[in-house]
UniProtKB/Swiss-Prot annotation:
It catalyses: [protein]-peptidylproline (omega=180) = [protein]-peptidylproline (omega=0). Residues 142-230 form the PPIase FKBP-type domain. This is Peptidyl-prolyl cis-trans isomerase Mip. May be an essential virulence factor associated with macrophage infectivity. Exhibits PPIase activity. Its EC number is 5.2.1.8.
Length: 230
């Protein structure tokens, strides 16, 4: 319950406005109160929380001024618990729908992509295209690699890029997603590949909240710069 409710209430605790005609914001307290009200309202809208603004203001005012509330603590707790339960069910349903939609889009993309010139497909579904060949010994899962890369969603949105940061990334090969492991252990230093990673070899049904949705196929341009043997 705290995850869904308290962030909004903590922002709005000083809000004392109701749905009246606009009044001038003369003092800093006026501006602060209004700003917190706007922030709280935006949070409710963002999370699709349906409230009655006047009743919300009444409850806020009663609590802030120390007045007797119109509901007991037990009644309010039960109401908020029921709200959280419904919100969680709604969120899970939406996630399931999104996962199904993304899975269909990913399958369609990979099915079309595998027939494009230069694209090769491995037995596990990973697809890749060699943009530049490399030389030397390929890394093993026990090695550390240094790479430059750009990650994109299938709609073209760039979600991560070492090129933009201006600095290559170095990491143990064991620490990255399966799709990267499969590709990099086949690459040689200096190679540049574009890899097309199905959801099960990327972030799966969980996704990476805020960045990558559930069941999203990903596209990476990867330049293997060097390998450090372990």
């Amino acid at each position: 319950m705290k995850r869904l409710i308290l962030p909004f209430l903590s922002v709005g605790l000083l809000l004392g406005t109701t749905a009246h005609a606009a009044t001038p914001l003369k003092t800093e307290q006026d501006k602060l109160s209004y700003s917190m009200g706007v922030m709280t309202g935006k949070a409710f809208r963002k999370h699709d929380i349906k409230i009655d603004p006047q009743t919300f203001s009444m409850g806020l005012s009663d609590a802030y001024l120390g007045k007797e509330t119109q509901m007991t603590e037990a009644e309010m707790r039960q109401t908020l618990q029921q709200f959280e339960k419904q919100s969680l069910q709604k969120m899970q349903h939406k996630m399931k729908q999104t996962a199904q939609q993304n899975a269909e889009k990913s399958r369609a993309f990979l099915t079309a992509n595998k027939n494009k010139p230069g694209v090769k497909t491995l037995a596990n579904g990973l697809q890749y295209k060699v943009l530049q060949a490399g030389q030397g010994q390929s890394p093993t899962l026990n090695d550390e690699v240094t790479v430059n890369y750009e990650g994109r969603l299938i709609n073209g949105t760039v979600f991560d890029s070492s090129y933009k940061r201006g600095q290559p990334a170095t990491f143990p090969l064991k620490s990255v997603i399966k799709g990267w492991q499969e590709a990099l252990t086949r690459m040689k230093p200096g190679a540049i590949w574009e890899i097309y990673v199905p959801p099960q070899l990327a972030y799966g049904e969980q996704g990476a909240p805020g960045v990558i949705g559930p069941n999203e196929a990903l596209i990476f341009k990867v330049n293997l710069i060097s390998v450090k043997k372990k």
